[in-house]
Amino acid sequence: MKFELQHTDNASDARTGVITTDHGQIQTPIFMPVGTCGSVKGVHFRELREQVKAQIILGNTYHLYLRPGLDTLKAAGGLHGFNGWERPILTDSGGFQVFSLTGIRKLKEEGCEFRSHIDGSKHFFTPENVMDTERIIGADIMMAFDECPPGQSDYQYAKKSLGMTQRWLDRCIKRFNETEPLYGYKQSLFPIVQGCTYKDLRREAAKFIADKGADGNAIGGLAVGEPTEVMYEMIEVVNEILPKDKPRYLMGVGTPQNILEAIERGVDMFDCVMPTRNGRNAMLFTYNGTMNMRNKKWEKDFSPIDPDGCETDLVYTKAYLHHLFKAQELLAMQIASIHNLAFYLRLVTDARQHIEQGDFVTWKNSIIDQLGKRI
């Protein structure tokens, strides 16, 4: 993987670049649709390519390990061969899911024992077998296995957790370097900065990771209940230290406003389930604000869903989408998901254009309040 920094904004830390992988290029800043189990919920790959304009999607190691399982994925030639997506893929290590979805778990130095949320079966993740699992899945970008402490952890627990994450990272890197890709294309490993909301721990984590010389670096453990201003402060603290010549990935974030604020602070890559999850619940994001398509006000509004949006937005009307949600038709969730994902990709594409033009901050400030309004 190679990252080329192309433009930097004079008034902020915003920047544009290009990530080159063996499955294609990724223009940054970029939003990555989440395909937890190998698919983006409710959206066909054709629509992801042609309407959403997705350049890279995510898979999740925890979920793919449980279903369809490693034997199937290996026999298929990895996730690319299994699902037919020909562009880049990134896999999360499953750490967040192990520490959030599984109610019964035992954490120790070697790794984490947990029970499947599907059938209660017992499993054990270590840095080594997670690296092996991500090799089998075969994503272009692999995430290190880390401990994900609760967002409001006290300082002593956060410090202890960070120490564990750092030791696990060393083991991840060792295993990654000892193994080879399985399917004839290169893979990259991204470490993850943890440290909760403690500046000194975030700085320590960022310095530890910066010294590793990885192809890119991630910021984890944010957007888990802390105030947004605290999240932005943590991003600033970390990005002062992470190398500028490597892509920076803010995991699990967030709202359109969050993304623009993080771009201003030097973040390049984003993922979040919000566009599809909110879409399935009739909430649409637009430059004018958010729309609840179940509201009666849309009942006789025959204008396009978004006159500046993708093809789906132009084909269907607000009244029709309102009707579909009221009738509980599956098409409603599909249309809303396509719209929201296309909007998120348009947002980061527009941000990229304004960084290149040199007016990113002015543009961001002119739209950010409107983005959060309810229409």
Where are the regions a protein language model picked out?
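Glycine- and acidic
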Residues: 152-155, 159, 216-222, 330-333
